[in-house]
């Protein structure tokens, strides 16, 4: 039972490695070594964002779990909405910070004289769009873990970290070019957000009909 419930957390951590592997493969094909160097900056930045969202999700989990077990659906709903609002505020803040301070962020990792610097400065704002949707996804995964829907949380994590990531990295570059590579991860996050909202609204509709 514990393995089943916690497998989504394991996959969520592993999905960062999957993102790095796929990203390196696609970036080196399209932009060479400079592209990989630019993408590595996003890979350094991404785990920081992950830890913030994970902290919010883990803070909400015991409250949601306790009230779910106590038969208090209204408190579960309020806690979920509070967690989503908090994560969204952080996500929007991270996105704005990425856009406004892009050059300063990149300069922390690489000198301005390298070609990778310009690639990263041009690409990070695209990549930063995903921070907003990533916030919702982490809360959604944590929510389904808390209400003993481990299988659902695992499916969401697999879609986000593998399936949608593959679609983004291999479908967008031929259509959008270089921006499409940077938008692959945001697309995966966006599709995951749509999926989470879809199943959440479906669950509420079924409950209302009962």
Indicate residue ranges for each PLM-predicted region.
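Small-residue-rich hydrophobic transmembrane alpha-helices
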Residues: 38-96, 100-102, 134-156
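Helix-terminus/linker motif at the lipid-water interface of multi-pass membrane proteins
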Residues: 17-44, 48, 66, 104-113, ...
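Membrane-helix interface segments
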Residues: 34-35, 150-152, 177-178
């Amino acid at each position: 039972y514990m393995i089943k419930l916690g497998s989504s957390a394991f996959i969520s951590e592993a999905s960062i490695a999957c993102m790095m592997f796929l990203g390196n493969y696609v970036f080196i094909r399209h932009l060479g070594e400079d592209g990989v160097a630019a993408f590595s900056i996003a890979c350094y930045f991404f785990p920081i964002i992950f830890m913030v969202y994970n902290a919010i999700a883990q803070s909400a989990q015991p409250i949601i779990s306790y009230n779910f077990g106590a038969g208090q659906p209204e408190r579960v709903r309020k806690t979920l909405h509070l967690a989503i609002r908090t994560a969204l505020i952080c996500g929007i803040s991270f996105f704005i910070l990425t856009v406004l301070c892009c050059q300063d962020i990149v300069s922390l990792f690489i000198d301005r004289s390298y070609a990778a610097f310009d690639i990263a400065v041009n690409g990070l704002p695209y990549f930063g769009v995903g921070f907003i949707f990533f916030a919702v996804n982490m809360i959604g995964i944590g929510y389904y873990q808390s209400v003993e829907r481990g299988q659902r949380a695992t499916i969401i994590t697999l879609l986000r970290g593998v399936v949608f990531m593959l679609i983004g990295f291999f479908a967008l570059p031929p259509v959008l070019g270089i921006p499409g590579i940077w938008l692959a991860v945001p697309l995966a996050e966006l599709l995951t957000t749509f999926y989470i909202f879809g199943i959440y609204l479906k669950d509420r509709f079924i409950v209302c009909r009962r």
